[in-house]
Amino acid sequence: MNKVILLLIFSILTTTSMAQKKIKQTAGRDQLGTFAPKFAELNDDILFGEVWSRTEQLSLRDRSLVTITSLISQGITDSSLTFHLQSAKNNGITRTEIAEIITHIGFYAGWPKAWAAFRLAKEVWNEDISKDKDEKTTFQREMI
């Protein structure tokens, strides 16, 4: 009986550890490593390595949505919001969805904060439009 319990516990631990792939982040160490090494460690290993890696509890897409909402609500419109907007895009949030998300946030967090966030979101999601236009222009030139 004890062997069965131990085997069951081992298989649960193995399955859990295999299912949760840790996110590898080096931004903290790259940008603050020698200036603030402990902060860099907490950023890379705990925030991203542990918290963001808990995808069974909350998907990366949903974590992006929560993070963006939090940053915009605080009025943070610096490179950290740009980074998280790009992450949200990479995690599956569409241009239509981000427009609706920021519009909704505007009613609760403030209209000026939404305006500022839209400026950054437009840059992140318009990369696709610019790329499409460049490809279309190239194709049109080739047809002439």
Short names for language-model regions:
Residues T77-S80, W111:
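Short loop/beta submotifs within extracellular cysteine-rich repeat domains
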Residues S79-T103:
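A cross-kingdom feature marking solvent-exposed beta-strand/loop segments within repeated
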Residues S64, H104-W115:
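Substrate/cofactor-recognition hotspot
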Residues D62-I72, L81, I98-I102:
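Short, structured motif recognition centered on aromatic/hydrophobic residues
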Residues Q20-D62, T82, N90, A114-I144:
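Acidic, glycine/proline-rich low-complexity segments that act as flexible tails and inter-domain linkers
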Residues M1-K21:
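Bacterial Sec-dependent N-terminal signal peptides
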